[in-house]
């Protein structure tokens, strides 16, 4: 029986417990999840691509069924190059759905072989985003329940340096 592989794309700047929840729940459905960090030069990221990959690899170190990679270009092309057939997207609210629906439709128009699976975030993470985490952290607010400890420390380091 062929392995069921899904790609979970994003900027993960930084990875949060909301992202990790989607990965954990996705692994109930798929044999492997590729956490695909987008090389998006249009986004102004706090962490470099290498820093983000390193953090995610360290957070997922004990999970042999999740691996981290980077991609640029069309997501559909990347998914097919990895012998995957599904893109996982987490949805927090209705406002996420409209944008994600349009992207899923575009991806489907490019390749009929790639499906998009929308997963609703678990209730405790319904409001959580990397942007909120960065904003709270930049103001020295508590982010303990939002990100893993190593991410919290990386954020603390970033915001303690003059910018």
From Swiss-Prot:
The keyword Magnesium applies. One of its GO terms (cellular component) is cytoplasm. It catalyses: (R)-4'-phosphopantetheine + ATP + H(+) = 3'-dephospho-CoA + diphosphate. InterPro entries: Cyt_trans-like, PPAT, Rossmann-like_a/b/a_fold. Its cofactor is Mg(2+). ATP binds at residues 11-12, 19, 90-92, 100, 125-131. This is Phosphopantetheine adenylyltransferase. It comes from Geobacter metallireducens (strain ATCC 53774 / DSM 7210 / GS-15). The lineage of its organism: Bacteria, Pseudomonadati, Thermodesulfobacteriota, Desulfuromonadia, Geobacterales.
């Amino acid at each position: 029986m062929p392995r069921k592989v899904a790609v979970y794309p994003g900027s993960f700047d930084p990875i949060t417990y909301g992202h990790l929840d989607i990965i954990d729940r996705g692994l109930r459905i798929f044999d492997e999840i590729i956490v695909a960090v987008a090389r998006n030069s249009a986004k102004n990221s706090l962490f470099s691509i290498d820093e983000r990959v390193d953090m995610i690899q360290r957070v997922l170190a004990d999970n042999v069924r999740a691996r981290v990679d980077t991609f640029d270009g069309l997501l559909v092309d990347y998914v097919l190059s990895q012998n995957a057939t599904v893109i996982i997207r987490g949805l927090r609210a209705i406002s996420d759905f409209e944008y994600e629906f349009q992207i899923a439709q575009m991806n489907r128009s490019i390749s009929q072989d790639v499906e998009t699976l929308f997963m609703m975030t678990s209730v405790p993470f319904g409001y959580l985003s990397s942007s909120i985490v960065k904003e709270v952290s930049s103001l020295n607010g508590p982010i303990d329940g939002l990100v893993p400890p190593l991410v919290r420390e990386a954020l603390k380091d970033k915001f303690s340096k003059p910018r």
